[in-house]
Swiss-Prot record:
<dbReference type="GO" id="GO:0005524">
    <property type="term" value="F:ATP binding"/>
</dbReference>
<dbReference type="Pfam" id="PF05746">
    <property type="entry name" value="DALR_1"/>
</dbReference>
<dbReference type="InterPro" id="IPR006194">
    <property type="entry name" value="Gly-tRNA-synth_heterodimer"/>
</dbReference>
<dbReference type="GO" id="GO:0004814">
    <property type="term" value="F:arginine-tRNA ligase activity"/>
</dbReference>
<comment type="subunit">
    <text>Tetramer of two alpha and two beta subunits.</text>
</comment>
<keyword id="KW-0648">Protein biosynthesis</keyword>
<dbReference type="GO" id="GO:0004820">
    <property type="term" value="F:glycine-tRNA ligase activity"/>
</dbReference>
<dbReference type="GO" id="GO:0006420">
    <property type="term" value="P:arginyl-tRNA aminoacylation"/>
</dbReference>
<protein>
    <recommendedName>
        <fullName>Glycine--tRNA ligase beta subunit</fullName>
        <ecNumber>6.1.1.14</ecNumber>
    </recommendedName>
</protein>
<keyword id="KW-0030">Aminoacyl-tRNA synthetase</keyword>
<keyword id="KW-0963">Cytoplasm</keyword>
<keyword id="KW-0547">Nucleotide-binding</keyword>
<comment type="similarity">
    <text>Belongs to the class-II aminoacyl-tRNA synthetase family.</text>
</comment>
<dbReference type="InterPro" id="IPR015944">
    <property type="entry name" value="Gly-tRNA-synth_bsu"/>
</dbReference>
<dbReference type="InterPro" id="IPR008909">
    <property type="entry name" value="DALR_anticod-bd"/>
</dbReference>
<dbReference type="GO" id="GO:0006426">
    <property type="term" value="P:glycyl-tRNA aminoacylation"/>
</dbReference>
<dbReference type="GO" id="GO:0005829">
    <property type="term" value="C:cytosol"/>
</dbReference>
Length: 720
């Protein structure tokens, strides 16, 4: 079956756009072919700096004929109605068929469309694709009306079958499709005629072009790591940089060079960031010292001097860049060693948000909240306050101004230079974590206190000014902040009720972080000269906001637990219980219940509970009373009743102390033990007996079962 080969050859495509462009080319062309009746077995797209390539294998040589029937008006319909139908079908009156139907004679149009050759369809689809290609940015050149990311020079478009290769007849803005491509710009310039994809790929490789970006990346990494290994060094892994560099070259030649000794004492992260951001260099690390001592650059050509001239030029440019970094570092160190006060004062003039004040005001709120939270997480309040006050000082430093991605990390270096203990200095770096779902969370008590305070201040602040996430829009990353709080609390095993003081082992130290943070925003507003809310307004806002924000946390928690395989209805059942602002308590309850309901006993007990609850609810509605006065074993008539009484006594003796100790696994296991006696009870006993004493006693027994089960979670909310 035929194979389609397309290449769009242009000036250099930005590396960041190549992968998406290849995907778009494949999607647009293949979708267009399928819509026109041309199916295929497989397709793959490629990208290099100068070309987008698509190969479609085993496609149809032509589209199938299409026969379409369209029902029209009645045969005796007004002439205007018939004329309108003729216009819509493109047929004449004599071409219509008259058919008998239950509603009389009706006109039908039979439209037959012959199949079309693949070349004709490909030409239409490719021209549409080129003219409507979704580049993030595009340009026009010369007198052309065509827009492309960079000037488009050639279109290669071939259909190859058993009889040979055929050029698809296509011209787009003066560029006529052909069977010619070009090799490497420097190593193999000139035209190359091809006859199909295999021939195309082979000739390009011979012309120093590696078509597959993944293969280029593998070649870069293998060559770079081998060069480093030969000198007892290692290349710092950076997959994003590797992908980007693979998009900058068609024939990668990794070269390893030296960094001038003047710069080797810079922090490794500074060297790595400067080389990556400015030069697209890989960093090479000394395994013993951990210092960055070499760099790897990737050339797009081979040279007779084995890259010596290229390395010399790159080293010269790199030295100029690193001289700037060294200047920033030395200036920052002088300020850090003097106590960082100028930086902290400068933050008074840096706006965090026009409705939430300056960075300095925010830091003051975070420091207060961190000190409040410190006892809850095992940290010293004074140390937490100090750490919070220093954590963001580096935002005013020259190094962070140049490289914003180093915020926090540089703060740790500067805090250490100022003479602060390592645990306080580490907070500057750790309190931003986690930045993503795979990032580690802070584990040191001081870092936990400040990280929680930072994220809670952000959340409560934006809730206070009604700037909440909506749909897919979350410009202030509030969902990430909430997930960060959830992960810090859960992964560190923290008992930290967000709103209510819930009785637990450390109840005397319980704080209310959401409430405290919201009140801090109220005070901040009152202290500003333009504060538009009275304190009574703020109190009402605090009450509303903390409940709404807690619901937001619960929504984020559902997403988090869903990834663990815990169903949303199980979480809802646990959310209905007291203490639902204690995230660890809530999750432990949900995990235990989820595991129990996965067992046969747990699932059957749930059905038994629902049956008991339904019978009891119907009886209470019919009788207008609540059956919760306690069942008496002396009125039990059957062995099954007596067995259920005994099983309840045994289970409650375990469940109540287990719940008090928050041992939900033991509580759910004891609850599941009721399954067999409850099943036997329903099999042998008629609850709504004619004897009213027996009936009331049995309903009270069901009420006791319901109450026992509801101590763990609101099982009425569980589906199934």
């Amino acid at each position: 079956m035929p194979e389609l080969l397309i290449e769009l050859f242009s000036e250099e495509i930005p590396a960041r756009m190549q992968a998406r462009a290849a995907q778009d080319l494949q999607k647009l062309v293949t979708n267009g072919l399928v819509e026109a009746g041309i199916t295929y077995a497989g397709a793959r797209a490629y990208a290099t700096p100068r070309r987008l390539t698509l190969v479609v294998s085993d496609m149809l040589a032509a589209s199938a004929p299409v026969r379409e029937e369209r029902k029209g008006p009645k045969a005796d319909a007004p002439e205007k109605a018939i004329e309108g139908f003729l216009r819509s079908t493109g047929l004449g009156r004599e071409q219509l068929e008259t058919r008998e139907t239950p509603k009389g004679d009706v006109l039908f149009a039979v439209i037959e469309k012959p199949g079309r050759p693949a070349a004709e369809i490909v030409a239409e689809v490719l021209e549409t694709t080129i003219r409507n290609f979704p580049w993030p940015k595009s340009m026009r050149w010369g007198s052309s009306s065509l827009r492309w990311v960079r000037p488009l020079h050639r279109i290669l478009c071939l259909i190859r079958d058993e009889e040979g290769a055929e050029i698809v007849p296509l011209t787009v803005d003066g560029i006529t499709a052909g069977d010619v491509t070009e090799g490497h710009r420097f190593l193999a310039p000139g035209e190359i005629k091809v006859h199909g994809f295999e021939d195309y790929e082979t000739k390009l490789r011979r012309a120093k072009v590696i078509l597959d970006a993944e293969e280029r990346a593998e070649h870069i990494w293998a060559d770079a790591t081998n060069q480093a290994f030969a000198q007892g060094l290692e290349v710092v892994e950076d997959r994003r940089l590797l992908s980007e560099v693979a998009g900058l070259v068609e024939f990668p030649v990794p070269l390893m060079g030296e960094i001038d000794a003047d710069f080797l004492d810079l922090p490794p992260e500074v060297l790595q960031t400067s080389m990556k951001e400015h030069q697209k260099f890989f960093s090479v690390r000394d395994l013993k010292s951990g210092k960055i001592v070499r760099f790897v650059t990737v050339a797009n050509t081979e040279t007779t001097d084995h890259g010596a001239t290229i390395l010399a030029g790159n080293r010269k440019v790199l030295s100029a860049r690193l001289a700037d970094a060294k200047f920033f570092w030395e200036n920052d160190l002088r300020i850090a060693r003097a106590g960082m006060q100028p930086w902290r004062e400068a933050l008074e003039n840096v706006t965090f948000h026009n409705k939430l004040g300056s960075q300095a005001a925010r830091i003051a709120r975070i420091a207060d909240l961190a000190a409040t939270l410190a006892p809850q997480v095992g940290a010293d309040p004074d140390a937490a306050r100090t750490a919070a006050e220093l954590a963001k000082a580096d935002l005013s430093s020259e190094m962070v101004f140049e490289f914003p991605e180093l915020q926090g990390l540089m703060g740790r270096y500067y805090a250490e230079a100022a003479g602060h203990p390592a645990e306080i200095a580490a907070v500057a770096q750790d309190h931003y974590q986690p930045l993503g779902p795979s990032d580690a969370v802070p584990t040191a008590p001081l870092s936990i206190a400040v990280a929680l305070a930072d994220k809670l201040d952000t959340l409560t602040g934006f809730w206070a000014i009604d700037e909440k996430p909506t749909g897919s829009k979350d410009p202030f990353a509030l969902r990430r902040a909430a997930l960060g709080v959830i992960r810090i609390v859960l992964e560190n095993g923290l008992r930290l009720p967000l709103i209510n003081s819930v009785k637990h082992h450390n109840s005397e130290n319980t704080s209310r972080p959401l409430f405290s943070a919201l009140v801090a925003h109220a005070k901040t507003d009152q202290e500003r000269a333009d504060g538009s809310k009275s304190m009574s307004d703020w109190k009402a806002l605090v009450a509303r906001s903390q409940d709404d924000l807690l619901s937001f946390f619960h929504d984020r928690l559902k997403v988090f637990l869903r990834d663990e395989g815990i169903r949303h209805d199980i979480i809802d059942a646990c959310l209905a219980m007291e203490g639902n602002d204690d995230l660890l308590l809530l999750v432990n309850r949900a995990r235990a219940l989820s595991e129990t309901l996965k067992t046969e006993d747990g699932e059957n007990l749930l059905q038994g509970f629902k049956r008991a609850n339904n019978i009891l609810t119907q009886a209470e509605e019919a009788d207008g009373v609540e059956y919760s006065y306690g069942a008496d074993p002396k009125f039990a008539e059957t062995d099954e009743e007596r067995a259920l009484f005994a099983a309840l006594d045994t289970a409650e003796a375990v469940i109540d102390p287990a719940l008090e100790a928050e041992d939900f696994a033991a509580a759910t296991a004891a609850m599941a033990s009721l399954r067999a006696p409850l099943d036997a009870f329903f099999e042998a006993v008629q609850v709504n007996a004619e004897n009213q004493i027996l009936r009331r006693n049995r309903l009270n027994l069901l009420s006791r079962i319901r109450a026992t089960c509801l101590k763990l979670a609101d099982l009425t909310r569980i589906e199934g």
